[in-house]
């Protein structure tokens, strides 16, 4: 790790599905270990890292609502799924000597600390990787929105969205071979075109707080370090 990073502090958003690997459900420990190693490489560059992980590999609140159930209860279940994923990532980080802490938007003191903006930034100043669990702590908000919110609260230089593909495309490249990848977009263009990268609330929050969004493939070994050094394939969303 000799390259100079382009960012001092970042928020990494990973989907819960990213942790499944090829299993189709739950957590593939080897995938969690690989993501942890990518974060370790980022720390070796001197970059402060916060993380938000979704819970879709375990449970989705909207699945309850779609079958006539209570959306609020479903979302609470989804928030608990993010706590499970966050604990798994913390375990993988600790195995390779990376100091990390889980801060939950839902109080559960026997399991992890509760979130506060002041404590989160203090931990990051100390060099710890901070994993934000429990979404925003409120129903009806996605973990994408939680990622944008936490990025604003910790004053991150960039919000990195690790996805299944290497950027934002004009259409789903897995379904449309003619889909083209964008090198750069503005927040407004993402919203106006309805590009499926993050929900509109998350993109709008990032725009209002002038937060740079970088979309890249989370499946590339060392991909995070490459992005932090201004290398690698990605799409940058910025109004500057």
From Swiss-Prot:
What is its subcellular localisation?
Cytoplasm
Region (Involved in allosteric activation by GTP), start-end ranges: 21-26
**A single Pfam family, by name?**
AA_kinase
Principal localization reads cytoplasm
Enzyme Commission (EC) number = 2.7.4.22
GO BP term, pick one = UDP biosynthetic process
Q: Which reaction does it catalyse?
A: UMP + ATP = UDP + ADP
| Residues reported to bind ATP | 13-16, 56, 60, 163-164, 169, 172
Residues reported in the UniProt entry to bind UMP:
55, 75, 136-143
Summarize the activity regulation. Answer: Allosterically activated by GTP. Inhibited by UTP.
Q: Which UniProt keywords apply?
A: Allosteric enzyme, ATP-binding, Cytoplasm, Kinase, Nucleotide-binding, Pyrimidine biosynthesis, Transferase
GO molecular function terms attached to this record: ATP binding; UMP kinase activity
- Top EC class of this enzyme: transferase
Return the InterPro entries for the record.
Answer: AceGlu_kinase-like_sf (IPR036393), Asp/Glu/Uridylate_kinase (IPR001048), Uridylate_kinase (IPR011817), Uridylate_kinase_bac (IPR015963)
Give the protein's biological function: Catalyzes the reversible phosphorylation of UMP to UDP.
How does this chain assemble? Answer: Homohexamer.
Tell me its family. Answer: Belongs to the UMP kinase family.
Q: What is this protein called?
A: Uridylate kinase
Origin organism is Brucella melitensis biotype 1 (strain ATCC 23456 / CCUG 17765 / NCTC 10094 / 16M)
């Amino acid at each position: 790790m000799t390259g100079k990073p382009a960012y001092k502090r970042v928020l990494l958003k990973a989907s819960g599905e990213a942790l499944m690997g090829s299993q189709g459900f739950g957590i593939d420990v080897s995938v969690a270990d690989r993501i942890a190693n990518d974060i370790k490489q980022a720390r070796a560059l001197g970059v402060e890292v916060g993380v938000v992980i979704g819970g879709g590999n375990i449970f989705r609140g909207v699945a309850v609502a779609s079958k006539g159930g209570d959306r609020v209860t479903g979302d609470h279940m989804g928030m608990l799924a993010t706590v499970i994923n966050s604990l798994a990532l913390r375990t993988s980080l600790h195995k390779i000597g990376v100091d990390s802490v889980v801060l939950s938007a839902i109080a559960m003191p026997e399991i992890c600390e509760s979130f506060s903006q002041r404590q989160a930034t203090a931990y990051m100043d100390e060099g710890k990787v901070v994993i934000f669990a429990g979404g925003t702590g409120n129903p009806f908000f996605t973990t994408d929105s939680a990622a944008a919110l936490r990025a604003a609260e910790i004053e991150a230089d960039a919000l990195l969205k690790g996805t299944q593909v290497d950027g934002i495309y004009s259409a789903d490249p897995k379904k449309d071979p003619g889909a083209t990848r964008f090198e750069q977009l503005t927040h407004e263009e993402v919203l106006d075109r309805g590009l499926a990268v993050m929900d509109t609330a998350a993109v709008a929050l990032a725009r209002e707080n002038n937060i740079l969004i970088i979309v890249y493939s989370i499946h590339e070994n060392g991909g995070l370090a490459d992005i932090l050094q201004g290398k690698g394939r990605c799409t940058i969303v910025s109004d500057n």
